[in-house]
Amino acid sequence: MMKQFKEFAVRGNVVDMAVGIIVGGAFGKLVNTLVSDVMMPPLGFLTGGVDFTNLYFVLSEGSTPGPYAALEQARAAGAVTVNYGLFINAMISFIIMAFAVYLLVRGINSLRRKEEAAPPPSTKQCPFCLSTVPLKATRCPACTSGLEK
């Protein structure tokens, strides 16, 4: 049984999939950091200092009555909140991730693309004078020899 498991585990597809999952997880963290630490602060600055992580509304107050200055305070008080700012961050991360995957797949497909088949020839060579003649010709225009179809 261990031998079968070893054969399964070291098969190319399983190892490739494991590497893909690990690299994908790291790439996801990289994109999330890009969005939350690089893109959202300037976007917040351009929108008047809005911090998207603190965009939420309270459905039910917690043990400490609101209003809450930040989402962390609302969570600490046990308030029930809808965190649409975090959703905006996640949506932007998803769009960037999807676009990156699209570019990756597009690049791989262009590398794998097979050359298009050459169109069928429209001419042939006369066996007597070696002139180029149309494929459907029955007589060579240069030497007037009869040609086979």
From Swiss-Prot:
The reply to whether Protein biosynthesis figures as a keyword in the UniProt entry is no
The principal location of this protein is membrane
The similarity comment for this entry is: Belongs to the MscL family.
Coiled coil located at which positions? none
Could you tell me which PANTHER family the record lists for this protein?
LARGE-CONDUCTANCE MECHANOSENSITIVE CHANNEL, MECHANOSENSITIVE CHANNEL MSCL
One GO MF term attached to the UniProt entry: mechanosensitive monoatomic ion channel activity
Keywords tagged on the record: Cell inner membrane, Cell membrane, Ion channel, Ion transport, Membrane, Transmembrane, Transmembrane helix, Transport
Question: Its topology with respect to the membrane?
Answer: Multi-pass membrane protein
Instruction: Spell out the subcellular localization from the entry.
Output: Cell inner membrane
Among NCBIfam families, the record links this protein to: mscL, PRK00567.1-4
Pfam families according to UniProt: MscL
Q: Which residues cross the membrane?
A: 14-34, 85-105
Gene3D superfamilies from the UniProt entry: Large-conductance mechanosensitive channel, MscL, domain 1
This protein's assembly is summarised as: Homopentamer.
Kindly provide the name given to this protein in its UniProt entry.
Large-conductance mechanosensitive channel
- Gene Ontology CC terms: plasma membrane
Instruction: Using the record, list the residue span of the signal peptide; answer none if the entry has no such feature.
Output: none
Its annotated function is as follows:
Channel that opens in response to stretch forces in the membrane lipid bilayer. May participate in the regulation of osmotic pressure changes within the cell.
